[in-house]
Amino acid sequence: MSVSRRDVLRFAAATPALIGLGVAAESLCAPSASADGLGVLLDYAAGVIPASQIRAAGAAGSIRYVSDRRPGGNWMLGKPMQISEARDLNQNGLKIVSCYQYGKESSADWLGGQSAGIQHARRGWQLHTAAGGPAGAPIYASIDDDPSYEQYKQQVAPYLRGWESVIGHQRTGVYGNSKTIEWALQDGLGAYFWQHNWGSPGGRTHPAANLHQVEIDRRNVGGVGVDINNICKPQFGQWA
């Protein structure tokens, strides 16, 4: 049986906590508050959470998928983000960030290299635009793995170049561990970085990270499981 990133981090986590509507903001933000005090964002795929409940939980907004449900992903009721959800978040003063991930593990998007990057970037751009995303807002392309340096050079870097060829360097974000972020920086790939902790030594925040995913699968808002992400820089790819 294969073990996923979420399995590794979930098994390492303490007993899950539950938060919901009406719980004080400190319950959500205090354990994960960023050093700069910029707040936290939620990311989730299993459903759509009303803006009122996100606000009540103490989050500044959401990182939302502009990607389709993959085969067997019928539980991903929150994919892709729809314009009605985006309007609800905007009208309630919450931040929105776009991210893209279709495949996972053996079907990971980045395994297809540059041609896959072009294909997925085109689809991400379509869904981002359909949801009302601004033309200048970035999309985070997911490297939801702990790739080796050889995998980075042969597959991840070409995948990111594919994204940049479609939406441009300034609009390409990278979701990856701190090692992947460092390699991308060395190659001049990506303008925004969202760090996860699978393969990030000690879970330390990379200095270039705009966002840092610090907790997964431990909390629930509005009946939907959420991950917690620290905002590390004032500009983190939010819709303007």
Regions found by a protein language model. Give the residues of each.
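N-terminal secretory signal peptides and thylakoid transit peptides that target proteins
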Residues: M1-I19
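C-terminal region of N-terminal signal peptides and the immediate post-cleavage residues
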Residues: I19-G37
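Functionally critical loop-and-helix segments that line ligand-binding/catalytic clefts
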Residues: D36-G47, A51-Q53, I181-A240
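Hydrophobic faces of well-ordered beta-strands that scaffold small-molecule active sites
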Residues: V40-L42, S62-R64, I96-C99, I139, ...
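Substrate-binding cleft of extracellular glycoside hydrolase catalytic domains
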Residues: A46, R64-S148
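Anion (oxyanion) recognition and catalysis
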Residues: R55, N90, E164, G168
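Active-site cleft segment of glycoside hydrolase catalytic domains centered on the general acid/base Glu
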Residues: D146-I167
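Aromatic-lined carbohydrate-recognition surfaces of secreted/lumenal glycan-active proteins
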Residues: H169-I181
